[in-house]
Amino acid sequence: MSETDAGAPGAPEAAEGQAPGIRILAQFIRDLSFENPRAPDALRAAQTQPQIDLGVEMNARGREDGLFEVDLKLSARATRDDGALFVVELLYGGVFQIAGVPAEDLEPVLLIECPRYLFPFARRIIADVTAEGGFPPFMLDPIDFAGVYAARKAQEQEQVGHA
């Protein structure tokens, strides 16, 4: 699910008077996969809209240089009654420098705000690759990363309660 290392060497400490800040130092595709198992038959117009299952995961980890790597994993599977139309998976990453954020607030910044910065770029990649696969561009709706984070934390708490 999510992994953070708030105690990484060089992790930012909230200095008095220092304004919180997030700098994106790099963005990159870590992994990209597109499957079009029924091409070209699946490309014909159909009477029914496909069912699309969407998956979202966010992960973060501290690096030794005091920076943080954040990964946003998006997966989408489009199906109709007669089977899969396409499957796309993207693992999009970024390297962030975080300043002026107290340690107790670092995890939400890494798993909510940083993915929020990465999302428009990842969304565009998925739209482009589905269009290149012969389908209309798949434009992801905006994602409520705070809601996803809260749901994951609740699930983690539930698992701890059952352990």
UniProtKB/Swiss-Prot annotation:
Localization per Swiss-Prot or TrEMBL: Cytoplasm
GO molecular function, one term: unfolded protein binding
Keywords from the UniProt entry: Chaperone, Cytoplasm, Protein transport, Translocation, Transport
BP term (GO), one: protein tetramerization
Chief site of localization: cytoplasm
A Pfam family it matches: SecB
InterPro entries linked to this entry: SecB, SecB-like_sf
Superkingdom of the organism of origin: Bacteria
Alphabetical list of HAMAP family matching this protein: SecB
Family note: Belongs to the SecB family.
Listed name of the protein: Protein-export protein SecB
